[in-house]
Swiss-Prot record:
Cofactor(s) the protein needs: Zn(2+)
Function: Binds the 23S rRNA.
One matching Pfam family: Ribosomal_L31
InterPro entries cross-referenced by the UniProt entry: Ribosomal_bL28/bL31-like_sf, Ribosomal_bL31, Ribosomal_bL31_A, Ribosomal_bL31_sf
Gene Ontology terms describing biological process: translation
UniProt remark on cofactor binding: Binds 1 zinc ion per subunit.
UniProt: Zn(2+) binding residues: C16, C18, C38, C41
Annotated protein name in UniProt: Large ribosomal subunit protein bL31
HAMAP family per the UniProt record, alphabetical: Ribosomal_bL31_1
Species per Swiss-Prot/TrEMBL record: Vibrio vulnificus (strain YJ016)
GO molecular function, one term: structural constituent of ribosome
């Protein structure tokens, strides 16, 4: 490998919104990152049903134009 062309590989601390934190190795410039969900609080892994989606463009579109596409032709 050529010297000086590869990014630095270092430990990064990840903190989830549920309070869980863990360390992983990465080439990120940051020392820590914040996650919305992790394996301790994600509904797929916990088996609990809760809405994870924070909304977006599709939801806004459906709110505005959902009545128009209600199946009437």
């Amino acid at each position: 490998m050529k010297a000086g062309i590869h990014p630095e590989y270092k430990a990064v601390n990840a903190t989830c919104s549920c309070g869980n934190s863990f360390v992983f190795n990465s080439t990120l410039d940051k020392d820590s990152i914040h996650l919305d969900v992790c394996d301790k609080c994600h509904p797929f892994y916990t088996g609990k049903q809760r809405i994870v989606d924070t909304g977006g463009r599709v939801d806004r579109f459906n709110k505005r134009f959902g009545a128009l596409s209600s199946g009437k032709k």
